[in-house]
Amino acid sequence: RVIIPRSLAFWGLDNVHCVPEQMIKDGNFPTVDSPNPEFAEALTLGLRDAKKLDADILMASDPDADRVGMACKNSKGQWVLIDGNQTCMIFLWYIISNRKATGKMKPSDFIVKTIVTTELIHKIAEKQHVEMRDCYTGFKWIAREIALSEGKQQYIGGGEESYGFLAEDFVRDKDAVSACSLLAEICAYAKDNGKTLYDILMDIYKEYGFSKEHTINVERPGKAGAEEIQQMMANFRSNPPKDLGGSTVVLCKDYKTLEARDADGNITKLVMPETSNVLQWFCNDGTKVSVRPSGTEPKIKFYIEVKDVLTYASQYEALSNKAMQKIEDIKESLGLK
């Protein structure tokens, strides 16, 4: 409400409109069901004003300014939400591209993502010859990587699918203030090059491949629910799926045993700071499914990622629909339908 507009003004961005109803200090947050930009409903009033003003971009944060959500116009002029995976991908693509263009990139620079965040970031890092590190969910693990490399390597950006991002290493936690400023810079860069934020996203998909991510939360409240979640994880661990929505599983990662097993039964060790109750399955077509119990709520979470090839921006909607059908097939394979 205060810090983000001040930060944007500091960077010379004076054509900023704030939603009037949401500039009133009220800890009950009466304008939304939940003041969390992960939820589309939280951006309703912002979208209302963005349409009236014909704005270039909508950005939103939560009250403690750590998560950032955004929306922009697509090629048809329709407002679309940019999810957490897409946001993280755009941010890291821009940071790498900008540092290379300005001669600031060093061979020792690195980025970080969580293991459940889109694998397209790995493709970007690989093609751009930048070190990328995977860590567990939760920004403390990204901060850990920063601390471990302090004085030896430079962290230049990192994030997670749950709308948290950090550029540079000053804050050591997800930070919507710097993220919103970075987003504004990316939009200015796009405009200078005759593009929009949506065009930038499509360019990334065209170069590195299309990816669709979807998170499923299965709630199981109470003691019986907790036991059911434990049993689900035990069943997945002892009987991992061989097929996910028609895609053949070629690699299983178990972070509880820190082992990865391929289709031929070969086992390699996973290098992580400690064990965690997470399972991941990777398929021959790039499909990835991660499953873990929530650490704070009575639910088990499934993170699904499917791949395709996007040649033209006009294919995006059709590919998204195709991917969602694939995700439905994967849900059926997992017994979630």
Residue ranges, per PLM feature:
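N-terminal small/polar loop signature for handling phosphorylated ligands or for N-terminal nucleophile
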Residues: 10-67
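Active-site pocket-lining segments that scaffold enzyme catalytic pockets across diverse folds
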Residues: 1-12
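Short beta-strand-to-turn element immediately C-terminal to the catalytic PLP-Schiff-base lysine
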Residues: 70-73, 168
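Gly/Ser/Thr-rich active-site loops/lids in small-molecule metabolic enzymes
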Residues: 15-18, 78-96, 178-182
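Short glycine/serine/threonine-rich phosphate/pyrophosphate-binding segments
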Residues: 1-3, 65-69, 142, 165
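Phosphate-binding and adjacent anionic-ligand microenvironments
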Residues: 51, 55-57, 61, 78-80, ...
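Short, structured coil segments at secondary-structure junctions
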Residues: 11-12, 75, 128
